[in-house]
A protein has these predicted regions:
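An N-terminal hydrophobic leader/cap segment in hydrolases
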Residues: 1-44
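Alpha/beta-hydrolase superfamily serine-hydrolase fold, recognizing
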Residues: 30, 37-44, 49-315
Length: 315
């Protein structure tokens, strides 16, 4: 990375979170002039009495007209530090994903902190996953066709959903894709992960911001010991889904994502860990013309292709 770019990033990498200002900035993406037009459908699922909005993105006209029969699905949880972003601000990301992967994408509008602290947003995501796997959301979809996926805070939620599903036996995801996931419970100098220090300033997402996000997300200090809050707090990494983890070189979350993969692998799980060299946290939301995004989709499509072959063998 050249010195000019480093200077620009340093100027933009301020610490601290002001939630309303961050949401206002995120909402500017709703005005996206490069919006990708694909077939969409907005529906609701229930988390007890609360309606959780979800949006379906169809890869093409044929997949929509098929009645969703035998269509592979990505269940997606957006990032945003558990406090910002939405289905609407991630519209381009999910539209592009449907086109680039060729699968139906289901994006979940989970409730945000600090108005709704842990475990509310997580439980919204779990309810959506449970409904999808049970056939309540899309009756013709087979459970083995579903991939659970998320980026950043959404990667945290995806990992936690898969972990709780294993613990409860409510359903059994066969695969998950975690993009620069937030999996730890500490972003101070006490963090065991070196990238929190080496990448914690000067690369847009700072360790100070991550510490603030955790404070806004938690309901009480004890939450930080809960593996559904911070999956790296788990004691058991066995029997988790086949997993692809993508990390970014200049990201404070890099090392924790890679450590999560190593722990899963040591526990006997099938895991691929791919570091996107030169990338910063948040790169996945950039346009498809960006090389980091293209590289990520190559990894994702390769992972899903291998998984399809394995699934056929299982059948």
């Amino acid at each position: 990375m050249n010195k000019t770019m480093q200077a620009i990033l340093q100027a933009l990498s301020y610490g601290g979170i002001e939630v309303e200002a961050a949401r206002w900035i995120a909402d500017l993406k709703k005005l996206d002039p490069l919006r990708i037009f694909v077939k969409k459908l907005d529906i609701d699922i229930y988390n007890n009495e609360y309606k959780v909005p979800v949006r379906l993105y169809f890869a093409d006209e044929a997949s929509m007209e098929s009645g969703n029969e035998n269509v592979p699905v990505i269940l997606f949880f957006h990032g945003g530090g558990w406090t910002t972003e939405s289905v609407e601000t991630y519209d381009r990301v999910c539209s592009r994903m449907a086109q680039s992967i060729g699968q139906l994408v289901v994006s979940v509008e989970y409730r945000l902190a600090p108005e709704h602290r842990f475990p509310v947003g997580f439980e919204d995501c779990y309810a959506a996953a449970k409904a999808l796997f049970a056939g309540e959301l899309l009756p013709r979809i087979r459970p083995e066709q579903i991939t659970v996926m998320g980026d950043s805070a959404g990667g945290n939620l995806a990992a936690a959903v898969c972990m709780k599903a294993r613990d409860t036996g409510d359903f059994r995801p066969q695969r998950q894709i975690l993009i620069y996931p937030a999996l730890s419970n500490c972003y101070t100098e006490d963090s065991p992960y070196e990238s929190v220090r080496t990448n914690g300033t000067g690369y847009l997402l700072t360790s100070e911001k991550m510490a603030d996000y955790l404070e806004l997300y938690e309901s009480k200090p004890e939450d930080r010991k809960n593996p559904y809050f911070a999956p790296l707090c788990a004691e058991d990494y066995t029997n988790l889904p086949d997993t692809l983890i993508l990390t970014a070189e200049f990201d404070p979350l890099r090392d924790e994502g890679e450590e999560y993969g190593r722990r899963m692998r040591q526990a006997g799980c099938r895991v691929r860990i791919e570091r996107i060299e030169g990338a910063l946290h948040g790169y996945f939301a950039l346009g498809i013309q960006h090389l980091y995004v293209q590289e990520s989709f190559r990894h994702i499509n390769r992972f899903l292709s291998v998984e399809r072959a394995l699934n056929e063998q299982r059948l």
